[in-house]
């Protein structure tokens, strides 16, 4: 194998996706292998998810305008999946590559310019190429299909913005409708208004901020995930850490558990409506890498947008130290548009785990094949 082959664009074991395309290329997309036949599917099922991540929808996102309209190229017939690979494409329509012409000669602080050059000896400098946030279009398109399958299995996934800079959502007044109806994707209208006002000042100050996203996976049956190297929480963490700007992931109570006694942190088991349940959920719905039947709680911490309109020090490829002023169209905060990406990566992970789990028990296999 040649050293400069770009691996790492494929995710999943059975429900397997490969994303492709660059920020300023002709198009981006995804190929999905392993989707079961018979799922009712059209572009509108996918488009509603892509609309949540597309740019240019508010004053706190990049002014780049893209329709991000998806087209299904293969894998469906008469409105249903055929079980063969599904290919989805979204064409770029608003590239302004001249904004990035100077970037070919230097490395932007906080971006992957230097590391891509170090690895491949060559890079697409226009908007970051494969390291751009637009790469997530393929993930969201595939995740939309995963979410539709999961709904039929009784599993729902809801991600939202927990905080933006110092502004936090009040979880005691959680309002699911607010997630889709605010520019911040916060479940709290009041906090969202405060966050927008804060972000406007950040934008005027030519700076950027980070934030925290949270995801709740409801309806997961107990017993999903594998021990040791294929733990469900480990795979969720990997999936969400693969989102470009995410720098930390927590499951359940996360970092807080390091300050507790075992007597405080253990979730007591109980019987609820005749079923095994827990009185608390500090574990975040996963024990030993396997789902315990409770809601799975995941948080992701996102760094500030690295492209800021201030003079910054860096080096060029001579190399020598220089000062730069970045041009282009950039978000003062990434989090609101990344929320749906987190939701879709969680969906891809748990659906794949549930499909893998079909082979875990002989009685389940016997029951299935005897019925069929």
Please identify what each model-predicted range represents:
Residues 26-38, 134-155, 230, 234-238, ...:
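Alpha-helical support elements that line or immediately flank enzyme active sites
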Residues 16, 307-372:
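Internal helix-turn-beta structural module
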Residues 16-19, 124-135, 222-226, 283-286, ...:
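A short glycine/serine-rich beta->alpha loop
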Residues 20, 26, 206-321:
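Glycine-rich anion/phosphate-binding loop at the beta-strand->alpha-helix junction
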Residues 50-109, 113:
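Glycine-rich, N-terminal phosphate-binding loop and its surrounding beta-alpha-beta segment
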Residues 118-228:
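Glycine-rich, mobile lid/loop segments that gate access to catalytic sites or pores
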Residues 104-129, 312-330:
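Short acidic, glycine/tyrosine-flanked loop/strand segments centered on an H-E-D-like triad
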Residues 5-64:
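N-terminal, positively charged regions that mediate nucleic acid binding
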